[in-house]
């Protein structure tokens, strides 16, 4: 916070998460009560990353995971609603997916957040198998607008007879909305995903 305005230093996605957390909760940025034990770095194949933390006051061990909403939705068994954790049933899955779709249709980049408690043995030898049976905490929509010069560059490419193709790791609906807004494709264009 600088003169009443947020200023992000470093990775914009991490900065957006920190700003959102600070706006939602007064002590969200106070990580002094947690010790970071390990990190499972982002991998484009699994589309997520995790950290293992120890809450110093209680000794509780946590795995915190963020990544593609569709991946975390598949890996979650529970959902956090306020202070309560409940089974992630089909109604909650559909509600979550509707939120992701609405954010994606608004050209927002979406990331989901989930967590789980670990045993001491799991925390000492963290591996990718721990990123299962998670508790889904929510989804975040991040504005990641194209650079101002992108629209003009695309227009010039089209005028020169160059076919413009957009390749991105974004949610397909986000990618389509951005491509339409930039004049790359019409609104009824087909989006190909990685597996396709």
Region roles according to the model:
Residues 1-136, 142, 155-156, 168-184:
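Cytosolic catalytic regions of ATP/NTP-dependent phosphoryl-transfer enzymes
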Residues 42, 145-147, 196:
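A short acidic, often aromatic-flanked loop/helix-cap motif at beta-alpha or helix-coil junctions
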Residues 114, 195-196:
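Residues at the C-termini of beta-strands that transition into short coil/loop
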Residues 140-141, 193:
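Short acidic-hydrophobic, aromatic-tinged amphipathic segments that line or gate anion-handling sites
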Residues 142-162:
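Short, acidic loop-to-helix structural element flanking the phosphoryl-transfer center
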Residues 165:
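Short beta-strand/loop motif that positions the catalytic acidic residue
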Residues 186-195:
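Conserved RecA-like helicase motor-core motifs
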């Amino acid at each position: 916070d600088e003169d009443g305005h947020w200023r992000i230093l470093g990775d914009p996605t991490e900065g957006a998460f920190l700003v959102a957390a600070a706006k939602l909760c007064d002590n969200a940025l106070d990580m002094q009560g947690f010790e970071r034990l390990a990190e499972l770095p982002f991998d484009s194949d699994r589309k997520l990353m995790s950290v293992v933390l120890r809450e110093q006051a209680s000794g509780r061990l946590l795995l915190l995971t963020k990544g593609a909403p569709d991946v975390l939705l598949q890996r979650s068994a529970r959902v956090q609603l306020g202070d309560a954790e409940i089974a992630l049933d089909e109604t909650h899955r559909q509600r979550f997916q509707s939120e992701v779709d609405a954010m994606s249709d608004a050209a927002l980049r979406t990331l989901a957040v989930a967590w789980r408690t670990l045993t001491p043995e799991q925390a000492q030898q963290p591996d990718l198998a721990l990123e299962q049976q998670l508790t889904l905490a929510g989804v975040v929509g991040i504005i990641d607008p194209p650079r101002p010069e992108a629209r003009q560059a695309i227009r010039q490419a089209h005028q020169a007879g160059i076919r413009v193709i957009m390749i991105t790791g974004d949610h397909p609906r986000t990618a389509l909305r951005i491509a339409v807004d930039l004049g790359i494709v019409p609104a009824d264009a087909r989006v190909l995903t990685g597996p396709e």
